[in-house]
Regions:
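The feature captures the beta-strand-to-loop junction immediately N-terminal to the Walker
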Residues: 37-39
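Helix-to-loop junction immediately C-terminal to a conserved catalytic motif
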Residues: 52
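ABC ATPase NBD Q-loop/coupling interface
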Residues: 64-87
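Conserved ABC ATPase "signature" region
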Residues: 112, 127-148
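Conserved ABC ATPase signature
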Residues: 152-156, 160
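Catalytic Walker B motif of ABC-type/P-loop ATPase nucleotide-binding domains
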Residues: 177-181
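ABC ATPase nucleotide-binding domains
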Residues: 246, 250-274
Length: 274
């Protein structure tokens, strides 16, 4: 059995006095594709940022900090604090929920930013090699944007821009991908294409994926596992069909859901108001 790629022990996240996640014990092994689900404000973005190492995990966090994390997070068996940023960037990649383009750049230039851990350092700074450009073009092709390399990202639609962000994460070529709502702006067939691509990444050697998603049925179809937050500190983790059940999701989202079946297909649907 492979060693966990990512692991948390007693991870607790707080926003001021509110507990977002209480005592999370999570093990993510190579080959697994995890969906992170839960209502708005449950802490999904905060959790992904914490797993990525964007905030310190401290057993004695500052009392008045707006967001705090305590417990333990390890990637590849090493605590986050022990990773050098340059080395960590070759192991995990994070796709944020929103991207704001302060100035124009081509899609290829944006995707090349995902290659920053590998850029050759020269006297005048870091420069892309032919291999970096090839990796970026391959990533654009993987999201169906090979013809958009020269397009200014400020001229793209929301869905096209989101696919460029996904390409940048793929170009970073890390075993662990953390993605915050990576398909929220995509139409259905691009959602399916993107989730199939993430699933193939998880199936590769020593790789895993964690993505947040509000579409529970897409998550049930493409994820192998799920982490469900209830917005009150509670959580459930395990195989996706066990966790994203009508009972558990009804409790987490505060609205009754029911599971319908059509042969081998299943779907969660909202129950009618009575």
């Amino acid at each position: 059995m492979s060693a966990p790629l990512l692991q948390t022990h007693a991870l607790t996240l707080r926003a001021a006095e509110r507990v977002l996640v209480d005592g999370l014990d999570l093990v993510v092994a190579p080959g697994e594709c995890w969906c992170l689900a839960g209502p708005n404000g449950a802490g999904k973005t905060t959790l992904l940022g914490t797993l990525a190492g964007l905030r310190p995990v401290d057993d004695t966090p500052p009392r008045h900090a707006p967001l705090t994390a305590s417990g333990r997070v390890t990637i590849g068996g090493k605590a986050l604090a022990q990773w050098r940023p340059a080395s960590l960037a070759k192991v995990r990649a994070l796709m944020p929920q929103q991207t704001r383009d302060a100035f124009g750049a081509s899609a290829l230039e944006v995707v090349l930013a995902g290659r920053h851990p590998y850029l050759a350092q020269g006297r005048w700074g870091a420069w892309e090699s032919d291999d970096d450009v090839a990796a970026a073009m391959t990533a654009l092709a993987q999201v169906g944007l090979e013809g958009f390399a020269a397009r200014d990202v400020t001229t793209l639609s929301g869905g096209e821009r989101q696919r460029v962000s996904l390409a940048a994460v793929l170009a970073q070529a890390t075993p662990l991908l953390l993605l915050d709502e990576p398909v929220s702006h995509l139409d259905l067939h691009h959602q399916i294409d993107a989730l199939e691509r993430l699933g193939r990444h998880a199936e590769s050697d020593d790789a895993a994926v964690i993505f947040s998603c509000h579409d529970l049925n897409l998550a049930r179809r493409f994820a192998t596992h799920a982490l469900l937050l209830d917005g009150r500190g509670g959580w459930r983790a395990g195989p996706v069909r066990d966790i994203l059940s009508a009972e558990h999701c009804s409790h987490a989202f505060g609205y009754p859901l029911r599971l319908i079946r059509d042969g081998d297909d299943e779907a969660l649907v909202p129950a009618r108001r009575t």
